[in-house]
Design a protein with these regions (language model features):
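Generic anion/oxyanion-binding catalytic loop in active/binding sites
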Residues: 1, 45, 60
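Ribonuclease/tRNase effector modules and their secretory precursors
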Residues: 1, 25-27, 35, 71-75
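N-terminal first-folded block
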Residues: 1-27
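N-terminal, well-ordered alpha-helical segments
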Residues: 14, 41, 57-58
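Short non-domain terminal segments
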Residues: 19, 30-31, 69
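A short, structured beta-strand/loop element
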Residues: 25-54
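C-terminal structural segments of small proteins and small subunits
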Residues: 48-75
């Protein structure tokens, strides 16, 4: 099983858009994305920092409701 890559908020936002998510709003340092099927996720937007692998795993599994390998193939 591959390790989750280190991604920053901009890179993750591009991947989410590719997967069909749309940026609905941004409040402070958090971006709120929504999919047409109702799935939602919030991504912290700190430009100089990568998103922690633990948080990225949580987003993929719980928010995106995707298998980790499917997410990695979408990179």
């Amino acid at each position: 099983m591959s390790k989750m890559p280190l991604l920053n908020a901009r890179e993750l936002a591009k991947i989410l858009k590719k997967l069909g998510f749309e940026l609905k709003r941004q409040e402070g340092s958090h971006m709120f994305f929504e999919h047409t099927d109702g799935r939602t996720t919030v991504v912290p937007n700190h430009p100089s920092e990568d998103i922690d692998r633990g948080l990225l795993n949580k987003l993929v599994k719980q928010d995106l409701k995707m298998e980790r390998e499917r997410f990695l193939r979408s990179l």
